[in-house]
Amino acid sequence: MSRQLEPYQQIERSIQKTYHKRLWTPFITAVKQYDLIAPGDRIAACISGGKDSMLMAKLLQLLQRHSDVPFELVYLVMDPGYNAANRQKIEQNAALLHIPVTIFSSDIFEVTSSVGQSPCYLCARMRRGYLYSKARELGCNKIALGHHFSDVVETTVMSMFYGSQLQAMPPKLRSRNFPGMELIRPMYCIHEDDIIAWQHHNGLEFIQCACRFTERAAETGNDGSSSKRQEVKLLLRELRRTNPGVEKSIFHSIHSVCLDTMVGYKTGGVEHTFADCYRERGEMTQEDET
């Protein structure tokens, strides 16, 4: 007679069995392809309480359990001013998933609530600073965030449509303000739709953004559907009807940038123009190649 699995074990099995191809495989692909984890790393898995960061924490936990590469994990939750219900939901989900979280508090919601409309950028910047600081205090050399494939694609499109530049979201980067520390994105190759499917399969409920701004928006009927990211989500959804591979094409495009055809680009904070590079090469551009 087979032993009845605990809820957290059933959730783990769903990752490794039912959603192996859609979650575990792309997770491992990102870790290996972008060299995200090295022997001796001490990583702070940063958990906001949403579906993405909770899944990321579970994936890293499973990897640590089975990997030949030795590394340490800290499961870090920053409470930026959650209401009691959201704080409780995070703690309950962490217990359900058997994730031993370390929780610390900050006043981010208090500060950003006075900014005015859409304080999301400031909130994100402040969150990252607090997370880096606490992670370093706990002896970590890396923080892991739950950004996924869909975030990468949407950010790339948003940079062109609203930022007048071609800028992507890298799978890892070095911190400028916290020397010696890095940020990694282990879910870089995982699609959001697959995360949602896994969540529903297991009957899990996670918090959304949960900040005071979004709470007020929900109360007034403005649920954020006018946000630029939401606009891009809807656009990509529409494009998928005629081109199912559009998001994959955008994702692959940031891995295959042909600088010879770019009129201008920036690297290391230094701007380069097509004219400068053209003179340096000392050769004519062949029209039949473009």
PLM regions and their residue ranges:
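A structural signal for well-ordered alpha-helical scaffolds and beta->alpha junctions
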Residues: 20, 24, 87, 128, ...
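Long, contiguous hydrophobic alpha-helical segments, chiefly transmembrane helices and signal peptides
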Residues: 27, 31, 187, 232, ...
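The feature marks non-catalytic terminal segments
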Residues: 204-290
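Short, solvent-exposed coil/turn elements at secondary-structure transition points
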Residues: 79-81, 107-109, 175, 189, ...
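Catalytic subdomain that performs nucleotidyl-dependent activation
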Residues: 150-236
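Short, basic, helix/turn surface patches
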Residues: 126-138, 172-178, 233-253
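ATP-dependent adenylation/nucleotidyltransferase module used to activate substrates
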Residues: 2-158, 162-166, 170, 193-197, ...
